[in-house]
Each structure stands twice: as structure tokens, then as C-alpha cells.
Amino acid sequence: MQETFKFLRCNSQGEAVEDKYSLKTLKNHFVVRDEYNNLFRVFSSRDDFWEWEADQPFEQKCFHEVVFGFFPQRLKFDIDFPVNKSYSEEDNDDNVYNILDIIINVIMDVFYETYSLPYNINLTREQILLTDSIGLNKKRELKYSFHIILYTYSVLNNNEAKAFTSKVLENLPKHVYPFVDPQVNKSIQNFRIIGSHKKGSMRVKMFNEELADVFETSMTTKKSDTLITTPFETTCLPCILTHVKEMTNSCDSIQQNELEEVLKFAGVLCKNHCFLRVHKNLVLFKRTSPSYCEICKRMHDKDNTLILRVAGNKVYQHCRHDNKHSLLMGSLSGTTNFVEIYVDQVMTKSIEVHESILFEELPDTQKHIYDESSMREYERVPTLVVKAQMKIGKTIQLRNYLQKYYGNDSISKQQTIRFVTFRQIFSKNIQTRLPNFTLYSEVTGDLDSYERVIIQVESLFRLTSTAEPVDLLILDEVESIFNQFNSGLHKYFAPSFAIFMWMLETANHVICLDANLGNRTYNILQRFRGDVPIFFHWNQYQKAQNDMYYFTSSREIWLNNLLKDLLEDKKIVIPTNSLMEARLLQTFIQKKFPEKKIGFYSSKSTAHERESHFNNVSYYWGLIDILIYTPTISAGVSYEDKRFDVLYGFFNNMSCDVETCCQMLGRVRELKSKTYKICLQGKQNYFPETIEDIETFTLQKRDTLFQTINNHQLSFTYSKETGRPIYYKTPYYHLWLETMRIQHLSKNHFITRFINQVADTGAKVFILTGEKLETVKQYTSIKMEIKHQDYVNIASAETIDANKALLIKQNLKEGITVDQQDLFAYEKYKLLEFYAWHGNKITPKFVEQYNSFMTKQNYTGRVQISRGKTVHESLTMLQTQELNFHQWAMQHAEHHDLQFNYSFQSHMYAIMLLTKCGFKCVQDPNILTNEQLMTKLVDEFVQYDLSAVSFEFKLKKPNKMDPQTILKFINKVLGIRYGLKIHHNKGNYYIKNTKAGSLIPFVRQQIKQSPCVVSNLLPITETFSTKEESSPTREETSSIKEKTFTET
């Protein structure tokens, strides 16, 4: 039943709704404005309206709900994108998709502040209803409009709605604010009804399932959920105009320097979110993947649930789904350093530092776990794995085992034993403890005739497989042994690895020992000795419980602590995994304290010096005041005397893994003060971390070598001639995957893994404090001096020919001492050879610019991509070359294949990204307008998965797919591969060199001034059309994610 009225309010021109109905009686009716017939209709119920509305002609469905301000109503927002207007700020273009996402996030954030924290009322995205009306307006112009409705809640009246809307508008970014209509909460408000359109327009307000899926909002299609006036089906929110519980306004806003520190907490504990924005004392995040919530104790896969709240100097973690509880994450330390923040977490036992390994999950019958200051007797089992900290007696108990089962009174005294080590010096160290073993380096010829042999992995080729397996295979520092097979130092890799695997698979007994035992050893033993059970012998005694570790990420604080101890005449040990840092420290200390004696050992030390000193460290290290060394010294070298006072370690994630760094700390066994002061630094990396991801990435690079390139779309199909490759997964392949996993974990999580492993030994950890003096400026200037001197030494070195260069290379590989001047001459030769620049004089500046990793990488990329007349031809040539190598390597030397850096796929991805942007090749001179490029980016990339490209270039996958974020990602790829970028200038985009790329220009003919890339690519003559396209239809705009707005 319905009644019609010409007017809503009383007047002299005709009957109005107000003439017949009071506010009280209207509460039980549903009032609709009929725009088409210019009438107001009053229905006895909403159901009556829906029944009547269903029978009306489409063109007459122009209905609006009349919302009276004094009635309870849902919170609503009208989002409108005007035609022919830029929705961006210069280089910060945001498409509709991102603007909507921003608005929804701000609504949720303001709701959290206004209702969640004070009243524990939660809002999820599933409680948000999103409708659209996209299409052509009366002028045949494309227009986008959306309604956002919080359909499960209501507020008391329009004034409460106004207050909430105002708070939302206050928090919107400036470039987003204009799209939200602030005038939708008037005392009488007409709000379009679902299924209706404006008179003369075909833009119908409707549910959009695809839109709901994109934004993870409600999938409801219940029409009554879209109505604003709410008689009974919602929860009424507390009034915010009359009484407000403030939990944020009374708090100071987070400052920029504090924000950096707060974000570190999220980096540690919340890896599935990215930073969104700050609101007063709240740090808000956007979800990027599902994660487990420690507050709710369950997985969350939707909503931006994570919020960090700063109260005083405390940082709390909150979840939008549970506002009664929070987690104390730590305190603001006054620094902005991640290391200090994480150490604070360890100190307060807020996180678990022990990383359990698969051995711990073995059944009780297969493990012996205890906590004692010395080792118990080893079990006589086929596969024994021993884990214990250093200096608890692992080697002593091994000697007892050998004496018991292989001594003079044993029936196995003549059985074959092979003791494998990973370093030559370690082998000699072991022989001093096991004098009845033969050291491989002290005998020549056949080693099989010796019953007991200590042998380093690189020399395993001197053994042969026999009909009878060895009785006992000992792998001391087993994790390091596995690492060594991936070192690239093997002269005879294939026979060495083959004999190793034969012994591992067939030995009657295997004993593996390591303080840093990990899952790699378990997986390898399970795969290749799975027919016999593993027995795990673990002494959990924490020998290091009296050691004190002080950590910092501040080089200044670390240096000033070091200087203070040197001034107090303390004797210092300085291990570092950076050769440059080691040289810098040596020079810095020599200048400050010329009277002090420094022992310095690195890969640049002569073979004679390393051999003589490492075999008698007690003598040589007893002569020095300061010991500096790189990973040249790890396991196998031990100084037992109590001479040194403090250890200062400097480590980063650009070199060896965490386990090797921790081994370096134990080369001086007894520190007088038991004090270790460590500076840790590491940039964020994005290497694949699981065996599955690493394998996928590895096989994919080889898979593409067998595919045919589609020239038009730069896509792949399998060649009929070569077919799809079949990969034979050999033992080395599985070991290589395990080793890559460990390396990638260290590169991605270096700092946390380092601190965890130290704390897991029982050592006490603290934050290293001190003043930040001006020392670092002098330190930095010395670094520049060292680098410049290297450039000078290389530039002024003798110019040698290929024969002498080959001799130096062979001597280095054989471990034969090479004169320092010859080393510089060899570096000079390699530089000239790389750029084909022989016969040209070079300067120190030339060395600085052209000997950099990035310049060389860009040069190689440019040469490879410009060999053919087109990029397609160049790609095909590179693909053929690498395919031939791959097929040869798989037939002759698989380890070469896994260690080879295949570049074809990286080129394929880089060129694919470039062409999707609208450019034809790396030398394309054409210019794209802002509109052309932004349209390309949206059409080509909004729904494109960049995971494979991220893996290839070790880049973080973009968290959002708006045009500018995509373009930044593309420019990183082009910069890495070619030294190029898509540059923006005055509304136009074109290809431009990066700083490194400008050093190696593309040319048609060789030039004399500097190295260059002689390109065979044909000139690009075709220009891009600027012809305007016709307006798209409704069907062409069905996917909101594929559309953007740009300047015209």
C-alpha cells in the first residue's frame, strides 16, 4: 500500500507528506522520492516498496530513500569521480582502485579509534557494503560512483553521522578528500536506492560481486542491507557527541624518528603487513597475506587487523577483532635501530630464540638428550649425530669411541676409517688429537691403502670407491662440510663429490658432529641413509652461560667503545666478515695507536703466512695486541691462552652466513672478560627461503631455455624440437638446494638469526651503549682513502698479457703466494679484458667508475640485448647460447649448471616489462604521454602477478598495484639489468640512462673516449599514436581494477 504526495514539507502549492504524517507515524513507514515522476511515495513498509518497485519499467526506476535526520541510520559515504579530472598529484597517480582502498582503510581506522578502543566494538571489511554505479552520464562521458555503507551498525541520528564523517574527512590524504561528498548527512537526505538510476542516466546503483572480492567487503545481496534508515536490524553505536572515551587524543602524536623505531617492531613480528599511515598515537598497517594472530590465537586472512599503539614509551600490538587484549611489544629505547629493539625483545624474553630442528622430533628411542658439563659416551649405531656447544668434549668422547671400537683390543681395529674435514688447517688440527691417523697432505699417491685417513673435502678425489664400504665415516663440523661443496674451490669437484656420496650412502657407521647442527644435515641423512635410523645425541649444556654479548647497529657507538678499550690498553680480537671493514679497522687503529702490534689475516694474506701462523697460533698470536681476521679463520683454528680481553665483532649480511659468523667468534676460546661487543648491519633482502620456492625458481630459469619466444607478446610456448625438459635430481642437486636455503635465510634474516643463535647458547645479551662521537667521520675518510689507493694501485699497475694473467689465476687457485703488485696487475687485466679496453690508458677515476658491480652488470646486460637486429633476435641468440651450455653441463658437470648464472630469463622479464609499458626496445626514442603510460600500466599490470619477476631480481613484490608503484618496480628491474629507467618530465615519459648506465652508452660505432656498447639493434622509427579512443561502454568498464584516471 502506498500514497503519493507532490511535496515533502507543508506549503500552499499542494498536498505534502507532512500534512498527513507526524514524525512518530513516519517512523513506521518508508518514504521514497520518485525522481522520474517528481513525487514522494509513502509505503506502509519496505516490503511493500520492493514488491511495487519490481513491476516498474526500467527507465522509471529513479528512486531515492528519504532519510530523516532524527531517525537512527547507517553510516554512509558517497564517492564520486568527476569526469575529465586528474586523480593524482604529479608523480603520485592513484587509480580508482587505490583511492577506494584508501577511503575504506581510513573509515576502518577512524572506527577503530572512535568505537573499538573505547567500547570494544569491532568493524571488519565484511561488515562494509560497497555498491557502484559506473557508466556513461548524460554527456556520454564515463563516470564512476560508489556508495560505502557500514550496514551492521547505526548511529542515533544524522548529527552523529556527521561527526563520524568529519573525522574520516580529517584523516583522508589531500588528493583523496575531494572524492568524498561531505554533504550526505543533512536533516533530510535523499539517498539512491539499489537498482535505481538518475533520471536520464543509465548508471544503475547495483551490487558488484567482483568489487566485493577485490576489497574483501560484504558479499550480501540483500536489498534491505543497503537502506540507510534502520528500524531494527543493526547495532546502535555509542554517541560520540555527548560522551567520548578518548584513548588517542590525550596522547602525543608519533614523531618521525619514533615511527622508524616503532616500524621495526612490525618488521620483526608482523611480516604479513605493510605500513599504511599514522593516526595520532596509532600506527596502522595493511594486510599483504594471511597471518597468525597472537592476540586472537587464530589465523586472519582478511582485514587490516594489525595496529600498533604507543603509550608513553611502550609499544603495544592490537588486533581489530579483540580490543580487550593487547601485547606489550617493548619499549622505545631512544634509538631508531632494529638491532637494539630486537635485543630488548630477547632480554625481556618476549620472543623464542631457539629454532627447533628436525632431529628434536625423532622418537625417544632415537635420541639421547641431557644437560651436563661434559659429554657422555657415544652410542654405537649406524648413523650417529652429535650436537653440543664448543669446549664440552665432543672430540674427547670421539677419541674414546675410536679407542673402544677401533683400538688395539677391538675386533674392528683394522677397519677403514675416513675423517672428512672442510679446511686444510682443521685437518692438521685434528691430526694433533688423533696421531694414529694419516693426514692426506703428508702422503702422495693412493690413499686407499691407508686404513685411517684425515682428508679435506677438496681432496676426496684421491680416494676411490671399492667393493667394501668404509666402516666408519666421521664428519666433524658437518654443516661446514656441506657448505664447502658449494664454495667453488674444487679443482676436481665431480670425483670428490661422488666419493663423498658413496661413503655417506654405504658406510657401515657415520658420525656427524656440529655445534650448529641444522635441518640440512637431517634432510641429507634421511634422503641418502634413510634405510637406517638416525640417532641424535644432544648435550644441551650451555657452556656460554657466563658470556656477555653487547649488540648494536651503530658503528659510531661500537667504534667509540673499541677506542675506549684500546686506550685502556686492553687486548682486542676483531672478527669481521667484510674484507673492506677489516682493512679499514687495521688502518684506523694503526693511525690511532702506532705502537700496538696488529695481527691481520684475510683472503689476501699469503699462503705461507696463513699456513705457518695457523699451525702455531699460540706463538704468533701471543706476540700481538690486536687480532683482526675475516672468514679465512673459522673452525679448525683455536687459541686457548688467556691473553685477549674483549672481542669486537663487525658483521653484515653481504658475505657468509650466520653460522659461519658465529664460528668466527670462537677462534679465541678464552676471553678474560668473557665480553663480546658486536655491531650488526644488514639490508633487507627478498630471496626465496623454502626448498619449494628455490627449486621452482631454479627450474624455471632452465625451463625457459627450452621454450619458443612469441615475438609479438613476448610469451613462451614449448618448442616442438626440444620439448619440455626433464630434470634429473641428483644428490648434489638436493644438497645445493639445502645450502641455498640456509644462505637465503641468512641474507633475509641475518640480524635476528645471529642474535637468536647467540642467545640460544645461554649467553646473556645486552644493548651496547655509548656516545656517538666524531670518530666515524675520520673512519669514513680513511675508508675513502683506502678505496682511492686501490684505484690508484690498479690504474698504475703493470699492464700484463693474457699468458701472465693465466699464470696468476692458476697460482691463486692452487694457493701459491702471489706478489701484491701482481695482484693489482691481474685486477687491471681483468678490468681491461671485461670492457675490451686493452691498449687504452686508464685512471683511478676510470677504475672507480667501471670496476663497480652495477656498471659491469649493466654493461653485460646491454651487450647481450643488443647483439641482434631486434630484441627478439638478441633474446633468441642468448637463449640458444645458454641452452647449449645447460645441455653440456647436465651431461658432464651438473655442479657447473647449478652455479652458473643464467641471464636469459632476467632479460625476458625486463623486456616484457618494457614492452608492456609501450616501448619497443631498450633504445626506443619515443615519448609516451602520462595518459598513455598510465593506461598501459593499469591495463597490463593491475592483474599481473609479478612474483616470478620479484624472485628473479630479488626484489620485494609490490604491495599494491597502482601505476606509480608498478612503475617504480619496473624501473628497479630496468636499472639492475640495463642501467635504464622510464623517466618522467613535464607529463611525458621516455627511456633514460641511470648514473651507471650513462657510463656505457649504446653506439653504432666504437668510440675512443670510454667503453661503450656497439649495438646492432635497428632504429625505431614508428611513433605512438595520440589519437583519442572512443568512450568505453559499460561492459568495457566491468572490471574496476583495470581502469585508471590520468590527466588529459
UniProtKB/Swiss-Prot annotation:
Tell what triggers its expression: Expressed in the early phase of the viral replicative cycle.
Q: Which GO terms describe its molecular function?
A: ATP binding; DNA replication origin binding
Enumerate the Pfam families for this protein.
Answer: Herpes_ori_bp, Herpes_UL52
Q: Which GO biological process entries does UniProt record here?
A: DNA replication
Q: Which UniProt keywords apply?
A: DNA replication, Early protein
The superkingdom listed in its UniProt entry is Viruses
Q: Which InterPro entries match?
A: P-loop_NTPase, Replication_origin-bd
Region (Disordered): which ranges?
A: 1025-1048
What is this protein for, i.e. what is its function? May be involved in DNA replication.
Q: Which family does it belong to?
A: Belongs to the asfivirus F1055L family.
Q: What is this protein called?
A: Putative helicase/primase complex protein
State the organism of origin.
Answer: African swine fever virus (isolate Pig/Kenya/KEN-50/1950)
